[in-house]
Design a protein with these regions (language model features):
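Transition-metal
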Residues: 1-139, 199-227, 251
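Short beta-strand segments in beta-sandwich/barrel cores
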Residues: 261-262, 278-283, 297
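Short, basic/aromatic beta-hairpin or loop at an interaction surface
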Residues: 138-150, 268-279
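Ligand-binding loop in jelly-roll beta-barrel domains
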Residues: 80-82, 90-95, 104, 125-128, ...
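C-terminal amphipathic alpha-helical segment
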Residues: 195-263, 267
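Short acidic-glycine-tyrosine-enriched beta hairpin
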Residues: 157-169, 284-304
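Loop-centered beta-sheet repeat module
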Residues: 147-195
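His/acidic/aromatic-lined binding-pocket segments of jelly-roll/cupin-type domains
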Residues: 87-88, 96, 118-121, 159-160, ...
Length: 320
């Protein structure tokens, strides 16, 4: 079964910029594109297959039809017809709200299906781009509520100057916000549970403040303080470099300028490749060939045993 490409869902937002369309080499007229949903099984926002014999089918339809052949037997037992990951590109022309996501346990207690753990990988961003990630000082839930009320919550959160290649892991409970000028790839659990903590007192087009979820968020926040929330890793050429390993996804980055064959014969999972830079050709063990270039995301079925990658190409690899 050949690797699958999808028609991305472009989302215009009040904070969206102009980086996504040229990055994805698209010939479309759409302004303020803040997000490109690359591979999604979120109900109502399912991406549609763009190539091969399954062209025109929604991702969740394909999971239902192919089951473990597509996602892996263990994943199908765990998630059923729901695809477990959501892949996005995000371009922030303005600051996004400060947010937190619940753990699976807390989400179920609050009547939600599951929580959300995610990660960010920075693409070429503005020179002065920053983001917020994790508490930098010990606060109590009571102090948190007071800081939200008096507009000082940002003082308690670590702010990072960011550049291309930076990586941040966001386990459920870690407070965070994407800042102005950030352009990034996001890998997350399939979940729409987001609690907005603070929105910089902004008003929508109707003059209303956006809803905050201060109380729900207080239960979700991990109040532990860490010295560094940025993932430290050493870039390497022509090999996979692990960025994140967690129960929800495992992610590595590859930066290739010579051919490489990746062995998936022992892996019981789909694999997603997210193009970051350059262009390459991938050929699977059945002889199916497709291109992978910056701005493209490819779903490799679980039945695939090997992938040969050729070309000058940099990409993320993620699987469950």
């Amino acid at each position: 079964m050949e690797p699958l490409k999808f028609n991305a869902l472009l989302k215009s937002t009040i904070w969206g910029g102009e980086k996504i369309i040229p990055f994805k080499h698209l010939d479309v007229q759409q302004e303020n594109v803040g997000e490109s949903w690359e591979i999604s099984g979120v109900p109502g926002n399912e991406t549609v297959v763009a190539n091969g014999e399954y062209a025109g089918k929604k991702l969740n339809e394909l999971v239902h039809e192919l089951k473990g052949k597509l996602v892996g037997e263990a994943n199908y037992k765990r998630f059923g017809d729901e695809f477990p990951l959501l892949i996005k590109f995000i371009d922030a022309r303005q600051d996004l709200s400060i947010q937190v996501h619940p753990t699976d346990e807390i989400a179920k207690r609050q009547g939600k299906e599951r929580g959300k753990t995610e990660m960010w990988y920075l693409l070429p961003s503005d020179a002065d781009a920053t983001l917020l990630c994790g508490l930098k000082q010990q606060i109590t839930p009571t102090q948190y509520a007071e800081m939200v009320e008096n507009d000082t919550i940002c003082d308690a959160i670590s702010r990072y100057d960011v550049k291309e290649g930076d990586c941040f892991f966001l386990p459920a409970g870690r407070i965070h916000a994407i800042g102005t000028g950030c352009f990034l790839a996001e890998i997350q659990q399939t979940s729409d549970v987001t609690y907005r903590i603070y929105d910089f007192k902004r008003k929508d087009k109707n003059g209303n403040y956006r809803e905050l979820h201060t109380k729900q968020a207080a239960e979700c926040i991990n109040y532990n303080v860490e010295s560094n929330y940025r993932t430290e890793y050493t870039p390497q050429k022509n090999q996979g470099v692990s960025l994140v390993q967690c129960p929800y996804f495992n992610t590595a980055v590859y930066d290739l300028d010579e051919p490489m064959t990746i062995d998936y014969s022992e892996l019981d999972s789909f694999v997603i490749l997210i193009g970051l830079k350059g262009e390459g050709t991938i050929t699977d063990n059945e002889g199916n060939t497709t291109t992978l270039r910056a701005g493209e995301s490819i779903l490799v079925p679980a039945t695939t045993e090997t992938l040969k990658v050729e070309g000058n190409v940099k990409f993320l690899e993620t699987y469950v």
